[in-house]
């Protein structure tokens, strides 16, 4: 067991990326569990802004970890609609699937994940905020509001505003999307949206907003609610013609709602840039701290996916006594996860510059067959492609 606040591995952040890293590590190198600490700045259950979509890729990773997502309160979304001004196409997460994806509330999902980590022997120190880290050849020192910690390896799983990332990459271009979100009651009598479906509407693109408005069904304290919001990828340099809150209020008005009646919250999402650094000697990044989906801002499956690569890099570091972690970025970029993320970033930069309302209407209303093929071939189902590669190699 470690002495005092000295550990072999410290994971900063007890969200999906951090817990996935821990659980993958338990599978790969169970001897490291007792030498690993997870630090969380808040206490579970803590509020967390997120649309809450759980794609099939996320379920595959959870299944590989021996976890069953249906233990968490959730809604099975019947169809996912991709529209322009209320008209477009629909699809499901799997071509012959029974639903599009599941929707959870992050405070419940993250609490469940943390409990699973504790069940497998991990220690989590909550209410412990990391203020700074200093990496040297001998190890890493973490300064927190609860004192000083020491580790051989640190995993930055502390989100888009990552303290760990700033420590190893102090000067970089910002790659941060913007998101606003509200939770409303379910009012089927006022909305033309089917209550069992989710909706992505790209009607805001002609206004210079590089994204969409969304409307998901969810369950909160056992009651049906709708999670609604607006996403701006911010992948291009031009600014939107209108503020995000104005565009969101306009969309809500179409459903008999008013933004002023609800609590509006916002948060950034760091999107994936293949040119960026994901590690430094003794330190690596996962989840939002590394970068997630630029196209839709989808982060849960991506965060869970990073965990396997981080755990493998950590195991290799201790086995080889080489803590440079220089192979970590290459392992991600060469994997189907990295390929999917690169495609999403490229397509976001291409697609969101096409502001013509006529073009957007044509794409979503007439090209659904092509969109569904492209989404399956390049953006999702990366876990399935990765498994095929593994089987081919064995």
Question: Whereabouts are the PLM-identified features?
Answer:
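Glycine-rich FAD pyrophosphate-binding loop
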Residues: 10-14, 26-50
